[in-house]
């Protein structure tokens, strides 16, 4: 995705924009998988995030993920966003289940 598209789209508050990994098209044995057998991809890469949310004291608490982090998502949820013919999903930070350590 080009940087120009991200300048036009900036998540607010604790929202995180992710791009899901591509579903496997072959099994480990090399058999081509039909579309229905692929399953839902629950892993994604963070491509943008908002600044965070304010706490009771009015201080902004930053999000705990950064651009490039690999995260684990719930099976359902998120808002689908299409930017420059590429599909992304927008989640609240609290909806993200886990972050893979580097």
Curated annotation (Swiss-Prot):
Keyword annotations for this protein, in alphabetical order, are: Chaperone, Mitochondrion
Give the subcellular location: Mitochondrion matrix
Q: Mind telling me which GO cellular component terms the entry cites?
A: mitochondrial matrix
Q: Please list the GO terms describing molecular function.
A: ATP binding; metal ion binding; protein folding chaperone; protein-folding chaperone binding; unfolded protein binding
Note the InterPro entries from the entry. Answer: Chaperonin_GroES, Chaperonin_GroES_sf, Chaprnonin_Cpn10_CS, GroES-like_sf
Family under the similarity heading: Belongs to the GroES chaperonin family.
Q: Which domain of life is it from?
A: Eukaryota
- This protein is called 10 kDa heat shock protein, mitochondrial
Residues annotated as coiled-coil are: none
* Role this protein plays: Eukaryotic CPN10 homolog which is essential for mitochondrial protein biogenesis, together with CPN60. Binds to CPN60 in the presence of Mg-ATP and suppresses the ATPase activity of the latter.
């Amino acid at each position: 995705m080009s940087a120009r598209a991200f300048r036009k789209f900036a998540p607010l508050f604790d929202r995180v924009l992710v791009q899901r990994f591509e579903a496997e098209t072959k099994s480990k044995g090399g058999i081509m998988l039909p579309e229905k057998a692929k399953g839902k991809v629950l892993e994604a890469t963070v491509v943008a995030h908002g600044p965070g949310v304010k706490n009771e004291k009015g201080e902004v608490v930053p999000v705990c993920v950064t651009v490039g982090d690999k995260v684990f998502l719930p099976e359902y949820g998120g808002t689908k966003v299409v930017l420059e013919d590429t599909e992304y999903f927008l989640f609240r930070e609290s909806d993200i289940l886990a972050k893979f350590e580097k």
